[in-house]
Amino acid sequence: MKETVIRKLEGLMERYEEVQALLGEPNVVSDQDKFRALTREYSQLGEVVAGFQQYQQAEADLQAIEEMLSGDDAEMKAMAQEELAEAKQLIERVEAELQVLLLPKDPKDDSNCFLEIRAGAGGDEAAIFAGDLFRMYSKYSERRGWRMEIMSTSDGEHGGYKEIIVRMEGDSVYGIMKFESGGHRVQRVPETESQGRVHTSACTVMVLPEIPEKEIPEINPADLRIDTFRASGAGGQHINKTDSAIRITHIPTGTVVECQDERSQHKNKARAMSVLAARLAQQEEDKRRAEADSTRRSILSTGDRSDRIRTYNYPQGRVSDHRINLTLYRLSEVMEGDLDSLLKPLQQEYQADQLAALSENN
Protein backbone atom coordinates (compact mmCIF):
# COMPACT_ATOMS: atom_id res chain seq x y z
CA MET A 1 0.00 0.00 0.00
CA LYS A 2 1.23 3.53 -0.81
CA GLU A 3 2.87 5.45 2.04
CA THR A 4 0.48 8.39 1.45
CA VAL A 5 -2.53 6.08 1.93
CA ILE A 6 -1.04 4.63 5.13
CA ARG A 7 -0.49 8.16 6.51
CA LYS A 8 -4.10 9.03 5.69
CA LEU A 9 -5.30 5.90 7.49
CA GLU A 10 -3.15 6.72 10.53
CA GLY A 11 -4.71 10.20 10.59
CA LEU A 12 -8.21 8.69 10.48
CA MET A 13 -7.30 6.37 13.35
CA GLU A 14 -6.22 9.40 15.43
CA ARG A 15 -9.49 11.15 14.56
CA TYR A 16 -11.42 8.02 15.59
CA GLU A 17 -9.81 8.12 19.05
CA GLU A 18 -10.46 11.87 19.27
CA VAL A 19 -14.17 11.44 18.44
CA GLN A 20 -14.41 8.58 20.93
CA ALA A 21 -13.15 10.94 23.67
CA LEU A 22 -15.47 13.78 22.56
CA LEU A 23 -18.54 11.53 22.80
CA GLY A 24 -17.89 11.20 26.53
CA GLU A 25 -17.77 14.95 27.20
CA PRO A 26 -20.85 16.43 28.97
CA ASN A 27 -21.07 19.50 26.67
CA VAL A 28 -21.27 17.19 23.63
CA VAL A 29 -23.80 14.81 25.21
CA SER A 30 -26.07 17.78 26.03
CA ASP A 31 -25.95 19.09 22.43
CA GLN A 32 -28.09 16.61 20.49
CA ASP A 33 -27.13 17.90 17.01
CA LYS A 34 -23.40 17.69 17.76
CA PHE A 35 -23.81 14.33 19.51
CA ARG A 36 -25.68 12.84 16.51
CA ALA A 37 -23.10 14.17 14.03
CA LEU A 38 -20.18 12.78 16.06
CA THR A 39 -21.93 9.43 16.57
CA ARG A 40 -22.39 9.13 12.80
CA GLU A 41 -18.73 10.07 12.19
CA TYR A 42 -17.59 7.58 14.84
CA SER A 43 -19.56 4.79 13.17
CA GLN A 44 -18.14 5.60 9.71
CA LEU A 45 -14.56 5.88 11.00
CA GLY A 46 -15.00 2.60 12.89
CA GLU A 47 -15.28 0.67 9.61
CA VAL A 48 -12.06 2.23 8.28
CA VAL A 49 -10.17 1.68 11.55
CA ALA A 50 -11.25 -1.97 11.72
CA GLY A 51 -10.08 -2.49 8.13
CA PHE A 52 -6.75 -0.76 8.79
CA GLN A 53 -6.14 -2.86 11.91
CA GLN A 54 -6.85 -6.00 9.88
CA TYR A 55 -4.37 -4.76 7.25
CA GLN A 56 -1.69 -4.09 9.89
CA GLN A 57 -2.16 -7.58 11.36
CA ALA A 58 -2.00 -9.18 7.90
CA GLU A 59 1.24 -7.29 7.14
CA ALA A 60 2.76 -8.45 10.45
CA ASP A 61 1.72 -12.04 9.69
CA LEU A 62 3.29 -11.82 6.21
CA GLN A 63 6.53 -10.50 7.68
CA ALA A 64 6.63 -13.42 10.15
CA ILE A 65 6.06 -15.89 7.29
CA GLU A 66 8.88 -14.35 5.25
CA GLU A 67 11.23 -14.62 8.26
CA MET A 68 10.34 -18.30 8.57
CA LEU A 69 11.13 -18.78 4.87
CA SER A 70 14.59 -17.30 5.34
CA GLY A 71 15.36 -19.65 8.26
CA ASP A 72 17.13 -23.03 8.25
CA ASP A 73 14.29 -25.20 9.57
CA ALA A 74 13.01 -27.18 6.54
CA GLU A 75 9.72 -28.13 8.21
CA MET A 76 8.98 -24.51 9.19
CA LYS A 77 9.89 -23.33 5.68
CA ALA A 78 7.48 -25.82 4.11
CA MET A 79 4.68 -24.67 6.43
CA ALA A 80 5.45 -21.01 5.71
CA GLN A 81 5.41 -21.65 1.96
CA GLU A 82 1.85 -23.00 2.26
CA GLU A 83 0.72 -19.89 4.17
CA LEU A 84 2.48 -17.34 1.93
CA ALA A 85 -0.06 -17.21 -0.93
CA GLU A 86 -3.00 -17.05 1.48
CA ALA A 87 -1.38 -14.17 3.42
CA LYS A 88 -0.75 -12.19 0.22
CA GLN A 89 -4.34 -12.75 -0.97
CA LEU A 90 -5.66 -11.50 2.38
CA ILE A 91 -3.60 -8.30 2.11
CA GLU A 92 -4.88 -7.71 -1.46
CA ARG A 93 -8.49 -8.21 -0.35
CA VAL A 94 -8.18 -5.90 2.67
CA GLU A 95 -6.43 -3.25 0.54
CA ALA A 96 -9.30 -3.35 -1.98
CA GLU A 97 -11.87 -3.00 0.83
CA LEU A 98 -9.97 -0.04 2.29
CA GLN A 99 -9.87 1.63 -1.13
CA VAL A 100 -13.67 1.54 -1.24
CA LEU A 101 -13.95 2.83 2.35
CA LEU A 102 -11.64 5.74 1.47
CA LEU A 103 -13.67 6.84 -1.56
CA PRO A 104 -14.91 10.43 -1.18
CA LYS A 105 -18.28 10.37 0.54
CA ASP A 106 -21.15 12.44 -0.81
CA PRO A 107 -22.16 14.52 2.25
CA LYS A 108 -25.78 14.25 1.09
CA ASP A 109 -25.74 10.45 1.48
CA ASP A 110 -26.58 10.78 5.18
CA SER A 111 -29.57 13.03 4.43
CA ASN A 112 -33.23 12.16 4.68
CA CYS A 113 -34.96 12.31 1.31
CA PHE A 114 -38.11 12.95 -0.66
CA LEU A 115 -39.41 10.10 -2.82
CA GLU A 116 -41.65 11.15 -5.72
CA ILE A 117 -43.50 8.56 -7.83
CA ARG A 118 -45.48 9.66 -10.90
CA ALA A 119 -47.61 7.60 -13.25
CA GLY A 120 -46.47 7.94 -16.87
CA ALA A 121 -47.64 6.23 -20.05
CA GLY A 122 -50.28 3.56 -19.52
CA GLY A 123 -53.26 5.37 -18.01
CA ASP A 124 -54.99 3.58 -15.12
CA GLU A 125 -52.48 0.72 -15.16
CA ALA A 126 -49.59 3.20 -14.71
CA ALA A 127 -51.32 4.69 -11.65
CA ILE A 128 -51.87 1.19 -10.20
CA PHE A 129 -48.18 0.42 -10.78
CA ALA A 130 -47.23 3.67 -9.01
CA GLY A 131 -49.17 2.31 -6.03
CA ASP A 132 -47.28 -1.00 -6.29
CA LEU A 133 -43.94 0.84 -6.30
CA PHE A 134 -44.98 2.86 -3.25
CA ARG A 135 -45.88 -0.38 -1.46
CA MET A 136 -42.51 -1.91 -2.47
CA TYR A 137 -40.61 1.08 -1.06
CA SER A 138 -42.76 1.02 2.10
CA LYS A 139 -41.88 -2.64 2.67
CA TYR A 140 -38.19 -1.92 2.08
CA SER A 141 -38.36 1.04 4.45
CA GLU A 142 -39.84 -1.21 7.16
CA ARG A 143 -36.98 -3.71 6.71
CA ARG A 144 -34.40 -0.97 7.21
CA GLY A 145 -36.17 0.65 10.14
CA TRP A 146 -36.78 3.91 8.26
CA ARG A 147 -39.79 6.17 8.71
CA MET A 148 -42.04 7.24 5.83
CA GLU A 149 -44.39 10.20 5.88
CA ILE A 150 -46.79 10.97 3.02
CA MET A 151 -46.50 14.61 1.94
CA SER A 152 -48.93 14.73 -0.98
CA THR A 153 -51.03 12.35 -3.07
CA SER A 154 -53.10 12.48 -6.23
CA ASP A 155 -55.15 9.28 -6.41
CA GLY A 156 -55.65 7.23 -9.57
CA GLU A 157 -59.24 6.75 -10.75
CA HIS A 158 -59.04 2.95 -10.40
CA GLY A 159 -56.51 2.67 -7.59
CA GLY A 160 -52.90 3.61 -7.10
CA TYR A 161 -51.60 7.13 -7.58
CA LYS A 162 -51.19 9.62 -10.37
CA GLU A 163 -48.55 11.12 -8.09
CA ILE A 164 -47.33 10.54 -4.55
CA ILE A 165 -44.62 12.42 -2.63
CA VAL A 166 -43.18 10.87 0.52
CA ARG A 167 -40.56 12.00 3.03
CA MET A 168 -38.19 9.22 4.12
CA GLU A 169 -36.18 9.46 7.32
CA GLY A 170 -33.44 7.18 8.68
CA ASP A 171 -29.80 6.14 8.45
CA SER A 172 -28.21 6.79 5.02
CA VAL A 173 -31.65 7.01 3.35
CA TYR A 174 -30.58 9.18 0.42
CA GLY A 175 -27.28 7.35 -0.07
CA ILE A 176 -29.18 4.09 -0.58
CA MET A 177 -32.34 5.33 -2.30
CA LYS A 178 -30.66 7.67 -4.83
CA PHE A 179 -30.18 4.74 -7.23
CA GLU A 180 -33.99 4.51 -7.67
CA SER A 181 -34.36 7.75 -9.65
CA GLY A 182 -35.39 7.14 -13.26
CA GLY A 183 -37.99 5.44 -15.43
CA HIS A 184 -39.56 2.20 -14.16
CA ARG A 185 -41.45 0.07 -16.72
CA VAL A 186 -43.94 -2.70 -15.97
CA GLN A 187 -45.08 -5.46 -18.35
CA ARG A 188 -48.16 -7.41 -17.22
CA VAL A 189 -51.78 -8.26 -17.97
CA PRO A 190 -54.01 -5.57 -16.41
CA GLU A 191 -57.01 -6.75 -14.37
CA THR A 192 -59.27 -4.93 -16.82
CA GLU A 193 -57.77 -6.76 -19.85
CA SER A 194 -60.26 -9.40 -21.02
CA GLN A 195 -58.07 -10.77 -23.85
CA GLY A 196 -55.14 -11.61 -21.57
CA ARG A 197 -52.74 -9.36 -23.48
CA VAL A 198 -49.61 -8.04 -21.81
CA HIS A 199 -49.55 -4.25 -21.55
CA THR A 200 -46.55 -2.00 -20.93
CA SER A 201 -46.90 0.94 -18.54
CA ALA A 202 -44.39 3.27 -16.95
CA CYS A 203 -43.74 5.41 -13.89
CA THR A 204 -41.00 7.85 -13.04
CA VAL A 205 -39.30 7.91 -9.65
CA MET A 206 -37.35 10.87 -8.31
CA VAL A 207 -35.31 10.73 -5.10
CA LEU A 208 -34.17 14.09 -3.71
CA PRO A 209 -31.99 14.74 -0.64
CA GLU A 210 -33.78 16.84 1.96
CA ILE A 211 -32.02 20.14 2.64
CA PRO A 212 -31.70 20.88 6.38
CA GLU A 213 -33.90 23.83 7.36
CA LYS A 214 -30.86 25.96 8.33
CA GLU A 215 -29.30 25.40 4.88
CA ILE A 216 -32.33 26.13 2.66
CA PRO A 217 -31.30 29.06 0.42
CA GLU A 218 -33.43 32.17 0.21
CA ILE A 219 -35.82 32.06 -2.74
CA ASN A 220 -36.93 35.42 -4.09
CA PRO A 221 -40.67 35.75 -3.25
CA ALA A 222 -41.13 37.50 -6.62
CA ASP A 223 -40.13 34.21 -8.30
CA LEU A 224 -42.97 32.31 -6.61
CA ARG A 225 -46.66 32.00 -7.37
CA ILE A 226 -48.57 30.51 -4.46
CA ASP A 227 -52.11 29.21 -4.99
CA THR A 228 -54.47 27.71 -2.43
CA PHE A 229 -57.13 25.16 -3.29
CA ARG A 230 -59.37 22.62 -1.65
CA ALA A 231 -57.80 19.25 -0.96
CA SER A 232 -59.34 16.30 -2.77
CA GLY A 233 -59.53 12.58 -2.09
CA ALA A 234 -59.94 10.57 1.07
CA GLY A 235 -59.08 12.35 4.26
CA GLY A 236 -62.07 12.85 6.53
CA GLN A 237 -64.71 15.50 7.09
CA HIS A 238 -62.33 18.45 6.85
CA ILE A 239 -61.79 17.79 3.14
CA ASN A 240 -63.32 20.42 0.82
CA LYS A 241 -64.28 22.72 3.71
CA THR A 242 -61.17 24.93 3.67
CA ASP A 243 -58.61 25.93 1.06
CA SER A 244 -55.78 24.26 2.99
CA ALA A 245 -53.95 22.72 0.01
CA ILE A 246 -51.02 24.66 -1.44
CA ARG A 247 -49.55 24.84 -4.93
CA ILE A 248 -46.23 26.67 -5.33
CA THR A 249 -44.86 27.50 -8.78
CA HIS A 250 -41.24 28.58 -9.19
CA ILE A 251 -41.71 30.88 -12.17
CA PRO A 252 -38.10 30.93 -13.56
CA THR A 253 -37.92 27.13 -13.85
CA GLY A 254 -41.61 26.23 -14.11
CA THR A 255 -41.20 23.81 -11.18
CA VAL A 256 -44.54 23.10 -9.47
CA VAL A 257 -45.04 21.54 -6.04
CA GLU A 258 -48.37 20.71 -4.42
CA CYS A 259 -49.00 19.71 -0.82
CA GLN A 260 -52.43 18.88 0.56
CA ASP A 261 -51.93 16.22 3.21
CA GLU A 262 -52.08 18.46 6.28
CA ARG A 263 -55.18 20.28 7.52
CA SER A 264 -53.11 23.40 8.15
CA GLN A 265 -52.37 25.66 5.19
CA HIS A 266 -49.23 26.88 7.02
CA LYS A 267 -47.90 23.32 7.40
CA ASN A 268 -48.67 22.48 3.78
CA LYS A 269 -46.81 25.60 2.63
CA ALA A 270 -43.75 24.74 4.77
CA ARG A 271 -43.70 21.21 3.37
CA ALA A 272 -44.11 22.39 -0.22
CA MET A 273 -41.25 24.89 0.21
CA SER A 274 -39.04 22.10 1.55
CA VAL A 275 -39.75 19.91 -1.51
CA LEU A 276 -39.29 22.89 -3.86
CA ALA A 277 -35.87 23.69 -2.36
CA ALA A 278 -34.82 20.05 -2.81
CA ARG A 279 -35.97 20.02 -6.46
CA LEU A 280 -34.20 23.27 -7.33
CA ALA A 281 -30.99 22.07 -5.67
CA GLN A 282 -31.19 18.79 -7.61
CA GLN A 283 -31.65 20.64 -10.90
CA GLU A 284 -28.44 22.57 -10.18
CA GLU A 285 -26.63 19.35 -9.20
CA ASP A 286 -27.74 17.59 -12.42
CA LYS A 287 -26.52 20.55 -14.48
CA ARG A 288 -23.17 20.62 -12.64
CA ARG A 289 -22.68 16.87 -13.06
CA ALA A 290 -23.46 17.05 -16.79
CA GLU A 291 -20.99 19.92 -17.30
CA ALA A 292 -18.26 18.31 -15.17
CA ASP A 293 -18.15 15.05 -17.10
CA SER A 294 -20.42 14.54 -20.07
CA THR A 295 -18.40 11.56 -21.34
CA ARG A 296 -18.56 9.24 -18.33
CA ARG A 297 -21.68 7.11 -17.97
CA SER A 298 -23.36 7.35 -14.59
CA ILE A 299 -25.42 4.81 -12.71
CA LEU A 300 -27.13 7.77 -11.03
CA SER A 301 -30.06 8.88 -13.16
CA THR A 302 -31.58 12.34 -13.32
CA GLY A 303 -35.04 10.84 -12.87
CA ASP A 304 -36.07 11.81 -16.39
CA ARG A 305 -38.89 9.65 -17.77
CA SER A 306 -36.84 8.89 -20.90
CA ASP A 307 -34.07 7.41 -18.75
CA ARG A 308 -35.48 3.89 -18.31
CA ILE A 309 -33.55 2.15 -15.55
CA ARG A 310 -35.63 -0.93 -14.73
CA THR A 311 -38.27 -3.30 -16.13
CA TYR A 312 -40.64 -5.43 -14.05
CA ASN A 313 -41.96 -8.33 -16.17
CA TYR A 314 -44.79 -10.14 -14.34
CA PRO A 315 -45.46 -13.04 -16.78
CA GLN A 316 -41.79 -14.10 -16.47
CA GLY A 317 -41.39 -13.15 -12.80
CA ARG A 318 -38.40 -11.11 -13.92
CA VAL A 319 -36.91 -7.76 -12.90
CA SER A 320 -34.09 -6.26 -14.98
CA ASP A 321 -31.89 -3.29 -14.13
CA HIS A 322 -30.64 -1.92 -17.44
CA ARG A 323 -27.79 0.18 -16.00
CA ILE A 324 -25.75 -2.85 -14.97
CA ASN A 325 -27.38 -5.55 -17.16
CA LEU A 326 -28.68 -7.35 -14.08
CA THR A 327 -31.66 -9.72 -14.42
CA LEU A 328 -33.24 -11.50 -11.44
CA TYR A 329 -36.08 -14.02 -11.59
CA ARG A 330 -37.42 -13.07 -8.18
CA LEU A 331 -39.92 -10.33 -8.95
CA SER A 332 -42.34 -11.27 -6.15
CA GLU A 333 -39.56 -10.97 -3.53
CA VAL A 334 -38.49 -7.57 -4.92
CA MET A 335 -42.07 -6.26 -4.84
CA GLU A 336 -42.27 -7.41 -1.20
CA GLY A 337 -39.37 -5.13 -0.34
CA ASP A 338 -36.26 -7.22 -1.08
CA LEU A 339 -34.56 -4.33 -2.86
CA ASP A 340 -31.07 -5.07 -1.54
CA SER A 341 -30.70 -7.76 -4.23
CA LEU A 342 -30.81 -4.88 -6.75
CA LEU A 343 -29.32 -2.02 -4.76
CA LYS A 344 -26.17 -3.75 -3.50
CA PRO A 345 -24.90 -4.64 -7.03
CA LEU A 346 -25.69 -1.04 -8.07
CA GLN A 347 -23.68 0.34 -5.15
CA GLN A 348 -20.75 -1.94 -6.02
CA GLU A 349 -20.81 -0.84 -9.67
CA TYR A 350 -21.01 2.81 -8.60
CA GLN A 351 -17.97 2.35 -6.33
CA ALA A 352 -16.08 0.66 -9.18
CA ASP A 353 -16.87 3.66 -11.41
CA GLN A 354 -15.58 6.02 -8.69
CA LEU A 355 -12.35 4.02 -8.36
CA ALA A 356 -11.90 4.09 -12.15
CA ALA A 357 -12.40 7.87 -12.19
CA LEU A 358 -9.83 8.31 -9.40
CA SER A 359 -7.31 6.17 -11.31
CA GLU A 360 -7.81 8.25 -14.46
CA ASN A 361 -7.38 11.51 -12.52
CA ASN A 362 -4.21 10.21 -10.88
From Swiss-Prot:
The modification N5-methylglutamine is found at residue 237. The keyword Cytoplasm applies. It holds the Pfam family PCRF. GO terms for molecular function: translation release factor activity, codon specific. It is found in: Cytoplasm. Its main location: cytoplasm. The keyword Hydrolase does not apply. Keywords: Cytoplasm, Methylation, Protein biosynthesis. Methylated by PrmC. Methylation increases the termination efficiency of RF1. Peptide chain release factor 1 directs the termination of translation in response to the peptide chain termination codons UAG and UAA. Belongs to the prokaryotic/mitochondrial release factor family. This is Peptide chain release factor 1.
